């Protein structure tokens, strides 16, 4: 690794304007996440031309895919945190070793998930109540996606490592390039052309698999040649007990956190479906809008994790605290503004996704009016969660997720919708109430962080002295 590159990137994040540093990291991450959502939009566009069964096949597969991905996402959280702290502490060799260890673990972890997912796919689809006419399409799509999860995990880990080192432009460019390729390959593999056979709905999965493979190889080459201040050495891929323990200790709670959200979403869907088709459709529309709205908050959360991690590693605890506070305030203001603007135009926004469906628009507009003003509270939580992860407090974010989903939101939604006169409105009210309570709880935990005891590099067998700028 070039120490000059590492020093330049790290110094830019350890000094000067915090706001400029947040924008420098956050904006490219936001753009990359928006592009990543383009995969889903492109697949939906072309698969939609195969008919409703093909569209339903992708829809019913998404919860399973999300759950499988959740099982491995903790490794990327651990990678970002440990690399950021090592870079901030000028422990460049250890940053390289962490990168190699996390990438290796992601590959090893993905293999049993891919094998189990392939053989359990029929059972999981039946468990979700997949209709018989949709089942063969869903099975072919799901098996291809699950079989190639090694590439999805691989690129996810590599871009997380780069972000931990402060490099966000290259993952953005790789995502943009593979998105363009996916847009070209989707119609070719779905409908066939010349010697290329028509794979139908499975063609969309094959295109995604190929492009994720290309993205992983590109990311690996970037890190192999040390172009971003971080370098993966193949000789460092042999598991090291202390590093593996640190990665698992940080990563496991993060995986449980995401699984809690995934299962919580399924639990909410169970409540919603019992209230009628129109309510279910309205819920689905608003939840999809929510997923798009929180993209800026995801970017701020990742930027916060990178900046806080590097500053904690460098021993700049007060700057790290200031980063968390400013990031939380910015996320709150931006998402609050988005929510309030959305309220004004909510009937038109909901109507775009549910044209000529007045009851869906009515329910969706009411739901949106209640949840949108609380978007800022979601942004605040996500930003501070980035600070928790950067200081190794993934257990805190896990507990907050479990409390939010299973002790507050779902019981509240059930009670208000079934045992009060609110009815359907009770379901909607559960969201802003939960957001308010969890924002307060998150702030309380953040203000109790002991910043002087947030360094994790000692657990890796690191020397207490800074390593020379050579690797």
Language-model regions, residue ranges each:
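Small-residue-rich hydrophobic transmembrane alpha-helices
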Residues: 55-119, 152-171, 269, 282-346, ...
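Short runs within selected transmembrane alpha-helices of multi-pass transporters and secretion channels
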Residues: 76, 145-163, 171-182, 204-217, ...
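Residue-level hotspots within pore-lining transmembrane alpha-helices
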Residues: 35, 39, 68-72, 112, ...
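Transmembrane helical elements of multi-pass membrane transporters/channels
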Residues: 24-43, 144, 211-215, 219, ...
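Helix-terminus/linker motif at the lipid-water interface of multi-pass membrane proteins
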Residues: 34, 38-56, 125-132, 188-199, ...
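Short alpha-helical transmembrane segments in multi-pass integral membrane proteins
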Residues: 1-26, 83-150, 196-252, 308-374, ...
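Small-residue hotspots at the loop-to-helix junctions and early N-terminal turns
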Residues: 52-63, 142, 205, 277-292, ...
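N-terminal transmembrane alpha-helices
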Residues: 13-45, 49-50, 66-78, 82, ...
């Amino acid at each position: 690794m070039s120490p000059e590159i590492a020093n330049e990137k790290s110094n830019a994040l350890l000094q000067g304007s915090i706001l400029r540093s947040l924008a420098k990291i956050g904006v490219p991450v936001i753009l990359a996440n928006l592009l990543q959502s383009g995969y889903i939009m492109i697949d939906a566009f072309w698969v939609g031309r195969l008919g409703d069964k093909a569209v339903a096949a992708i829809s019913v597969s998404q919860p399973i895919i999300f759950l499988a991905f959740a099982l491995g996402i903790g490794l990327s959280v651990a990678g970002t945190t440990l690399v950021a702290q090592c870079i901030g502490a000028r422990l460049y060799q250890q940053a390289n070793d962490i990168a190699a260890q996390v990438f290796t673990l992601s590959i090893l972890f993905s293999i049993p998930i891919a094998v189990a997912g392939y053989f359990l796919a029929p059972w999981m689809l039946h468990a979700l109540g997949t209709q018989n006419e949709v089942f063969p399409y869903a099975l072919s799509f799901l098996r291809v996606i699950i079989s190639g999860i090694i590439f999805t995990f691989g690129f996810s880990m590599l871009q997380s490592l780069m972000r931990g080192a402060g490099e966000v432009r290259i993952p953005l460019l790789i995502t943009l390039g593979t998105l363009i390729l996916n847009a070209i390959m989707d119609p070719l593999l779905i409908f066939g052309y010349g010697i290329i056979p028509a794979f139908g709905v499975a063609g969309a999965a094959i295109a995604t698999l190929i492009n994720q493979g290309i993205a992983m190889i590109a990311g690996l080459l970037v890190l192999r040649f040390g172009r971003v201040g971080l370098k993966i050495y193949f000789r460092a891929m042999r598991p090291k007990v202390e590093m593996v323990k640190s990665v698992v200790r940080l990563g496991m709670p993060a995986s449980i956190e995401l699984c809690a959200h995934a299962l919580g979403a399924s639990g909410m869907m169970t409540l919603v479906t019992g209230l009628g088709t129109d309510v279910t459709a309205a819920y689905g529309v608003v939840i999809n809008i929510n997923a798009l709205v929180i993209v800026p908050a995801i970017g701020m959360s990742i930027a916060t994790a990178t900046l806080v991690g590097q500053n904690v590693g460098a021993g700049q605890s007060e700057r790290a605290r200031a980063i968390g506070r400013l990031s939380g305030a910015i996320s709150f203001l931006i998402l609050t503004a988005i929510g309030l603007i959305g309220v004004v135009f909510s009937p038109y926004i909901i109507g775009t996704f549910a044209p000529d469906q007045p009851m869906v628009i009515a329910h969706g507009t009411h739901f949106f009016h209640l949840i949108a003003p609380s978007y800022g509270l979601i942004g605040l939580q996500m930003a501070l969660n980035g600070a928790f992860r950067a200081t190794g407090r993934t257990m805190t974010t896990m507990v907050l997720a479990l409390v939010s989903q299973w002790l507050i939101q779902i019981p509240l939604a059930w009670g208000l919708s079934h045992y009060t006169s609110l009815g359907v409105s009770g379901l909607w009210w559960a969201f802003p109430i939960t957001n308010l309570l969890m924002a307060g709880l998150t702030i309380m935990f953040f203000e109790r962080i002991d910043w002087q005891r947030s360094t994790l590099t000692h657990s890796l067998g690191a020397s207490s002295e800074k390593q020379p700028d050579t690797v």
